[in-house]
């Protein structure tokens, strides 16, 4: 057997024994471009036993076959360590995977590199799961046992399948304490959950809020509220369970918990529940699992006496089941996302109540059956676990033999080529330095944060740290809540002076949609912000105008800004009592006729001259006008004014009739609406009771 150094075209090199044109004996080989290194024994070009080191510092120590890891060996990948069997490059059939910085581990059977079959999963806080696995997830039947509540770890991740995430192979096998897992959409669960505790006395974030009239309708909201009074999520049940020292805010470490919902504001009810629960309370779940979550039939029981038997969905009570309280009382019915929505209490129809009770009994029987199967599967998993431990011990011996072969190969490579670069030890040094730096950073960051800010120590990946404790940036703009509200900009042409608005001319408060009117053009314009029906309603509320007016006074008030009579005073008739004319400039309800428009332009008063007309008391001033033009003008304008007055009188009569109709219709419409609402409520209640 000869030996030496051989350089390949891809940048790799081999230094060691050689026979028949192939690596044989002991030797050291680097991969393409010098990346990666294998040192150990060879058999005509294939690895037999040795150590492979990746550029990241990950290593495999064990046996090989046909160029793949096969047999027994130990893989160090990030902060995870696998010890056990290998089959054609994949983990399995039996093996153990554990975390180097926590107590999290899996012991059992494997298939294609994933947990598959039966095994035991132990979490960082000491909780365990024994049962079936499929494709790296808890699937089938199993038993989940938690540690005492005071020792259970707080789950801060918004999305996580397991406490230490024994599923992921990404990022060199290292999974951050709060790293997300791709398990599908999440359901809002109680805030601050604890590992292994899924019997929640709190409803979901949406159901925990008091149902309003406008969320799901007035009728459905009230009916839902009355039906769920016996639920563990109701307010009355919360108070009773607080007295019995039970708690919520808990879910399984494999469940998904959201801190964004229910963790802020005065409605955060997780703190009192966490404070009142007994620290020695434990919880056990026995039943079905689907896709790493409690789904199907199962039994969950706490050491304090709280027990649920029935159907589950995504770690929540969902379906028909029965909850037994610590004091012996029971509630049973249909659950929907942890809330009892259809119970057997206070039922109107006994037939429907019996159907619900039958479904509850079926759910309880299925849960007890599933619990018995889960206990059997847990016993099988325990036997598989003991076998996996034996394989792990054998893998440790295989790793020792592989290291011996690696040392022989390194010694031979130095003898054959002293200048040959061996990258393996350098990779491992880099990995050790990186781990030391990460550990020092994780130790320094909580010290800097804790004394300075008084905040509890949390992982830096924790979303709760960002959601609830991140202060506002100091250099940013001030909060919008602190700035005074900007004044509303007036509309074009508006004026703050009340005398320039249409309502001010008429002695009324101006409306929101009205536009200001100037003496020249405001009398004949309509406000674009109001429809014609609105103007009719507003006109109807005005005081009734006088039956007739004095044309001369109305005519000459437009010229002199006060009432003037040119002819000799005559005793006015009874229907011509002098009254102020608030309605003269307001004609915005209808488009004016050409004659009335000319009269209104002449009659529009000057600004700020609001002297009421007193024709009965004023004495006429001596005016010397030209006789013939005045008479002609007076005759023409009086004729036009009489026509306009007739039209105005007709319009005002129509407005008064509309007002009377509105007043007559208002009372019956209100009573009719109330009667319809009451009738709908009665029909809805009867319909719901008949359906359920």
Swiss-Prot record:
Phosphoserine sites (modified residues): 162, 165, 440, 442, 462, 479, 527, 533, 589, 593, 604, 609
GO cellular component: endoplasmic reticulum membrane; junctional membrane complex; membrane; nucleus; plasma membrane; sarcoplasmic reticulum; sarcoplasmic reticulum membrane; Z disc
GO terms of biological process kind: calcium ion homeostasis; positive regulation of cytosolic calcium ion concentration; regulation of cardiac muscle tissue development
Annotated MORN repeat ranges: 14-36, 38-59, 60-79, 82-104, 106-128, 129-151, 285-307, 308-330
Residue positions where Phosphothreonine is found in the record: 470, 483
Name this protein carries in UniProt: Junctophilin-2
Biased amino acid composition, Pro residues: 474-487
Site label Cleavage, positions: 155-156, 201-202, 565-566
Keywords: Cell membrane, Developmental protein, DNA-binding, Endoplasmic reticulum, Membrane, Nucleus, Phosphoprotein, Repeat, Repressor, Sarcoplasmic reticulum, Transcription, Transcription regulation, Transmembrane, Transmembrane helix
Residue ranges that the UniProt entry lists as topological domain Cytoplasmic: 1-670
Region ranges (Disordered): 164-190, 246-273, 439-661
Record's comment on post-translational modification: Proteolytically cleaved by calpain in response to cardiac stress. The major cleavage site takes place at the C-terminus and leads to the release of the Junctophilin-2 N-terminal fragment chain (JP2NT). Phosphorylation on Ser-165, probably by PKC, affects RYR1-mediated calcium ion release, interaction with TRPC3, and skeletal muscle myotubule development.
One term of GO molecular function: phosphatidylserine binding
Lineage: Eukaryota, Metazoa, Chordata, Craniata, Vertebrata
InterPro entries for the chain: Junctophilin, MORN
Family: Belongs to the junctophilin family.
SUBUNIT field: Interacts with TRPC3. Interacts with BAG5 and HSPA8; the interaction with HSPA8 is increased in the presence of BAG5. Junctophilin-2 N-terminal fragment: Interacts with MEF2C.
